[in-house]
Structures are given as C-alpha cells and as structure tokens.
C-alpha cells in the first residue's frame, strides 16, 4: 500500500530565472549569492523564496465544487501559521495558493515565492484525499500545516547534513519503496541529499 508522502516541488530550470527575479522584486533579501542559479534539486529550499518579514496575505483557490466544510477546515489549519508569523490565508477566486486534490498525486507544494511563477491555471499544492474530508483532525493538522509551511518557504528539516549523515541509505530505499513506491532516485533526492546550508 502506498501512503501519500510529501514531495516539495521544484520549478523547472526554464522557470528559475523568472522566479528568482520575481522573488527579489517581492523581497530584495531573496537575491542569490553571486547572482547565480544553484543546482535545480536545491532551488526549492533556499532562502531565496522567502516572503519577508513585513507579512503577507495569500489567497487560496479551491477546485470548483469543493465542499465548504473542506475549504473551512483547510483554511483553519493553514491559518494556524498566523499564531507564529505575520501571515494569513483567505479563500479567493484568483489565489496565489491553488489547491488540487489529485488522486495518486500525494501531498506536495511549491516553496515560498515560487508559487508566484506558476501559471494561474495550475495548482501550487496537492492534498490527495482531503476533498472527501473523512480523516481525523490530527491528520488535517499534520498535513495541512506541513504543506502550508512549504508554501511559506520552509524546507524539510530532515535534509540537514547532520541528519542525512545518520540515515542508512539501504534502509531508506527499502522503507520508501514499500510505503510510498519511491525509486532510489526519489529517495536520493528527497531524503539522502543534504541541503546546501549556506543558502538556507
């Protein structure tokens, strides 16, 4: 059985320069060191997608016919971030955060200001199975807060060098193959490749 896992989505290389320019226009602190583009596998987790400290209000768009109680629950848990940061999320017809519920798509989100570079008719986040709304509150809290954390620009904390160094690669390959159907390449990208911490 494949359990949906979170996979932060990186922009394609063809969109990176535009995304960097947009991120720097939004927040000058997002300027890349030495004005260069890093490895595409690392781009999505860099401080260069940071919203900034002035605060931000992001609109959230749901697929047509999404149950109003599902929308309310997602916004409830997304807005838990407002207890810790100057951020808020509200439903909008043309939101920057565009949710899909694609079956087999798992859980994923683009990171930080990268969502501003995604075409308006494309999702920026997937919450597989959340459109039916029949899961415990603990799962709503865990997944929705986690994915909206990526939307705020936060990477996976397990990708720090000191944590990755303690992971048995063969055990990781076996585990993620059995629970999520991941290939060795996916495990390498999502679990065993440490972040360049100078860019965090």
Regions found by a protein language model. Give the residues of each.
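Zinc-dependent metalloendopeptidases
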Residues: 1-200
């Amino acid at each position: 059985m494949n359990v949906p896992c979170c996979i932060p989505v990186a922009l394609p290389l063809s969109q990176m320069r535009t995304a960097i320019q947009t991120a720097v226009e939004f927040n000058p602190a997002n300027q890349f060191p030495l004005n260069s583009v890093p490895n595409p596998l690392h781009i999505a987790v860099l401080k260069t997608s940071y919203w900034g400290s002035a605060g931000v209000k992001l609109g959230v768009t749901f697929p047509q016919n999404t149950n109003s109680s599902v929308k309310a629950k997602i916004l409830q848990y997304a807005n838990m971030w407002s207890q810790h940061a100057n951020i808020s999320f509200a439903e909008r017809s043309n939101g920057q955060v565009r949710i899909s519920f694609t079956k087999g798509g798992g859980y994923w989100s683009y990171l930080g200001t990268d969502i501003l570079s995604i075409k308006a008719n494309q999702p920026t986040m997937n919450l597989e199975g959340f459109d039916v709304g029949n899961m415990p509150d603990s799962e709503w809290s865990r997944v929705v807060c986690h994915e909206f954390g990526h939307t705020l620009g936060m990477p996976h904390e397990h990708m720090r060098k000191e944590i990755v160094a303690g992971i048995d690669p063969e055990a990781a390959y076996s585990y993620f193959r059995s629970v999520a159907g991941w290939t060795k390449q996916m495990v390498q990208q999502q679990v065993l490749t440490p972040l360049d911490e100078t860019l965090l």
